[in-house]
Amino acid sequence: MAPTKKVPQVPETVLKRRKQRADARTKAAQHKVTVAAKNKEKKTQYFKRAEKYVQEYRNAQKEGLRLKREAEAKGDFYVPAEHKVAFVVRIRGINQLHPKPRKALQILRLRQINNGVFVKLNKATLPLLRIIEPYVAWGYPNNKTIHDLLYKRGYAKVDGNRVPITDNTIVEQSLGKFNIICLEDLAHEIATVGPHFKEATNFLWPFKLNNPTGGWTKKTNHFVEGGDFGNREDQINNLLRKMV
């Protein structure tokens, strides 16, 4: 009878490595499933928030229309609520610039031509806008304009660096503590001038826009005189469509 051959034993270190690799694969698979579930949950949350904001906007429009009709029926004038937020674009350079408007432009972070920022309209900012008026075009952005600026031209300030807002994670990491976790939240906070408007706008790097399609008309004249500078109220939306 032939002697039985011994099956060579697998070294213990090899077995340990195999187990470690198997455990690692299992953990990686579990992590992948967990991340996918969290991402799905977040996407649902983003969608619900966006829906909620759209409904709020529509309700506000309907209410405004109702009040206008009610006033007209009584023979009165309808006075809409005062605008709370402006978008300001620098349109002129620094040649022969007086120190006072230069300082005001720096305060508003409008350091270069075609830089743009959102500004909360109040007793502190309105005097600044009057000082810099010959050097800027400004007005009242609507919801669509705010969305277009954020989605097409939005950059964040992260650790002093200009970072493109490629996904909602960037927003959540910086503003999650204020319950602003996505671009829709950011747009809503700006449009409504929410309690964390300052944090929201400081998170954004000043927008860098193009010259308007077709060019400027006359930068040294006020908008009401057929020029470019100054408050153009709702017409700022037409200008920004040409610059985004």
From Swiss-Prot:
GO biological process: maturation of LSU-rRNA from tricistronic rRNA transcript (SSU-rRNA, 5.8S rRNA, LSU-rRNA)
Molecular-function annotations in GO: RNA binding; structural constituent of ribosome
InterPro entries named among the record's database cross-references: Ribo_uL30_ferredoxin-like_sf, Ribosomal_uL30, Ribosomal_uL30_CS, Ribosomal_uL30_euk, Ribosomal_uL30_euk_arc, Ribosomal_uL30_ferredoxin-like, Ribosomal_uL30_N_euk
Sequence segments annotated as region (Disordered): 1-37
Keywords from the named record: Ribonucleoprotein, Ribosomal protein, RNA-binding
GO CC entries: cytosolic large ribosomal subunit
Family: Belongs to the universal ribosomal protein uL30 family.
Primary role: Binds to G-rich structures in 28S rRNA and in mRNAs. Plays a regulatory role in the translation apparatus; inhibits cell-free translation of mRNAs.
Name this protein carries in UniProt: Large ribosomal subunit protein uL30
UniProt organism field: Caenorhabditis elegans
Gene for this chain: rpl-7
